[in-house]
Amino acid sequence: MDTPTKSRRANGSIAFPEDFKPVKRNIQSELNQELETCLFSFRDKEYSAEKFSGIVFREMGWKDFDRLDKERISLYWVDQVIHGVTGVLWSPGGYEDKENYFGSSLNFLKPSFKSPTAIVSQNGDVKVTYWFNDLKNKKVIQLQVIFDTNGDIKSRTILSSGDSQFYTGLSVIVGGATALALGLFFLRNKKFVTPVLRIASSKFKN
């Protein structure tokens, strides 16, 4: 059996096997029931992009990849293979309905956009974190995909969403407004509150 080796294109990027091809068709995710995944074709068979990444990566020589190679290939896989129909969000704009789901860092009702990242952890796992425009459910979600040391995907997790950010921000605003209202109430009624506190304090002393 031949040992897999890294094959590179003329521009220096790592080449996928010649018989590998992303299939732009969504199926139900098996790792997370709230998500979908696309397929890919390899050696005349179709596979789930989230369950069988390892068979392609190992063919490409995954264990010999350096850190940058693993980060680039993992991010490409998430963007072009798992989300092969629409891809991940590389910028906060460009929606069909012209609605901007993202706000500034001071906007508690909308999430702050962050570009996709891929980082190799100390244990060798690769963590890809990114935002995705979920057209099916009409919301943006922040996801994390973790590849293990064999190139297989071990988890797909929803970290946040536009909806969860809205309710979190709303609770922060309501909580802040309540605290402010109570503060103003006590300041305005200081003459009443102070004698009451003194009476209560004297009772405890007695």
From Swiss-Prot:
Topology of this chain in the membrane: Single-pass membrane protein
Location relative to the cell: Membrane
GO cellular component: membrane
Transmembrane segments: 166-186
Protein name as annotated: Uncharacterized protein DDB_G0281707
Lineage: Eukaryota, Amoebozoa, Evosea, Eumycetozoa, Dictyostelia
Main subcellular location of this protein, as a coarse class: membrane
Native source species: Dictyostelium discoideum
Keywords attached to this entry: Membrane, Transmembrane, Transmembrane helix
